[in-house]
Design a protein with these regions (language model features):
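Glycine-rich beta-alpha junction loops
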Residues: 2, 26, 79-81, 110, ...
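Solvent-exposed, charged/polar functional surfaces in cytosolic regulatory/catalytic domains
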Residues: 19, 66, 210
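Conserved N-terminal subdomain of the carbohydrate kinase-like
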Residues: 1-48, 53, 230-234
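Short, hinge-like loop/turn segments at secondary-structure boundaries
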Residues: 13-16, 90-94, 122-124, 151-155
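Acidic, amphipathic alpha-helical patches
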Residues: 35, 94, 162
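Conserved phosphate-binding/catalytic region of the ribokinase-like
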Residues: 118-234
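Short gly/ser/thr-rich secondary-structure transition/capping motifs
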Residues: 24-33, 83-89, 192-193
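Conserved beta-alpha-beta core of the PfkB/ribokinase-like small-molecule kinase fold
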Residues: 43, 49-125, 132, 142-143
Length: 234
C-alpha cells in the first residue's frame, strides 16, 4: 500500500507515563489485507493495534496461526480499549492468537480489561491455560510475574527515575527475544524450553533491564546491547 502509516500522538504526564491518541482512518492499517506476507524462521512479535484494527488484525492473526513450526511467537497483548469498536470480535481473535502463541506478555491493566472479574494472577493463569508456554505479567515498577506450567516466579524491576515510558513494552519484548536468540545459538534453548521457568525468567530479566534504560531517557529510545550488562547474556 502507498497509504501513510498509522499516527500515534503521545502525551506525557508529570510522572513520565503516556496517554495516546491514534489516527488510523486513511492509513495502511485499514488497507493491508492480503495473504502475500511471508514469515521466516526465528520470532514473530505482534500485539496492540496490530490485533485490534481490521482488516490488518485478521491478517496478522493468520500469520501467527499459520507460521512455520520453527518460528516462535511473542504476543504483547497491549489492549487499546479506546479503539476497540468490536470487543467480541477482538476477544475471539485474541483468544485464537493466544492459543497459538509461545509467549504472552501482558500488563496488569490489560488483565483488568480482559478479565474484570478476576485478580491479576488468576487472570494470568487463565491466559496460560489458553495454550502458551509462558505468560509474563508487567505492572510498572512492581516485580514482573512469570508463569509457566512449571510454576511461577518474579523478576525484580530496578529503581529508575522515569522520564518517558513510550516504548517501554516494546523494549522489554526486544530484550526478551534478544536474550533467547543469543542463547539459542550457543545452547539447547528452543521452543520446548519456553516452559522452563528459570530460562524464561532470565530472558525476562534482560527485558526488564533494557526497558529500565529506555524509560530513563526521553523518547522511544531502547538501548544498544552493549549498554546492558554482559552478565545478562549468560
Amino acid at each position: 500500500t502507498t497509504a501513510p502509516t498509522t499516527l500515534a500522538l503521545a502525551e506525557l504526564s508529570d510522572d513520565g507515563s503516556a496517554s495516546y491518541r491514534f489516527y488510523v482512518d486513511g492509513t495502511a492499517a485499514r488497507e493491508i489485507a492480503g495473504d502475500d506476507s511471508h514469515v521466516g524462521e526465528g520470532w514473530i512479535f505482534t500485539g496492540g493495534l496490530g490485533l485490534v484494527l481490521p482488516p490488518v488484525a485478521n491478517h496478522i492473526a493468520q500469520l501467527v496461526l499459520q507460521r512455520p513450526p520453527t518460528t516462535l511467537a511473542l504476543i504483547d497483548i497491549n489492549c487499546r480499549p479506546l479503539v476497540i469498536t468490536q470487543p467480541d470480535e477482538y476477544r475471539a481473535r485474541l483468544n485464537a492468537v493466544v492459543a497459538a502463541a509461545d509467549v504472552i506478555k501482558v500488563s496488569d491493566e490489560d488483565l483488568k480489561y480482559l478479565y474484570p472479574e478476576l485478580d491479576s494472577m488468576t487472570a494470568a493463569h487463565r491466559l496460560l491455560e489458553g495454550g502458551p508456554k509462558a505468560v509474563v505479567v508487567t505492572a510498572g515498577s512492581s516485580p514482573v510475574e512469570i508463569l509457566t506450567p512449571e510454576g511461577s516466579t518474579q523478576v525484580a524491576v530496578p529503581y529508575v527515575d522515569i522520564v518517558d515510558t513510550v516504548g517501554a513494552g516494546d523494549t522489554f519484548c526486544a530484550g526478551f527475544v534478544a536474550w533467547w536468540v543469543q542463547r539459542s545459538t550457543h545452547s539447547e534453548v528452543h521452543r520446548d524450553t519456553l516452559g522452563d521457568l528459570d530460562l524464561v525468567a532470565a530472558a525476562a530479566t534482560a527485558g526488564v533491564h533494557a526497558s529500565v534504560i529506555a524509560v530513563g531517557r526521553r523518547g522511544a529510545d531502547p538501548p544498544y546491547r552493549e549498554e546492558l550488562s554482559a552478565d545478562l547474556w549468560g
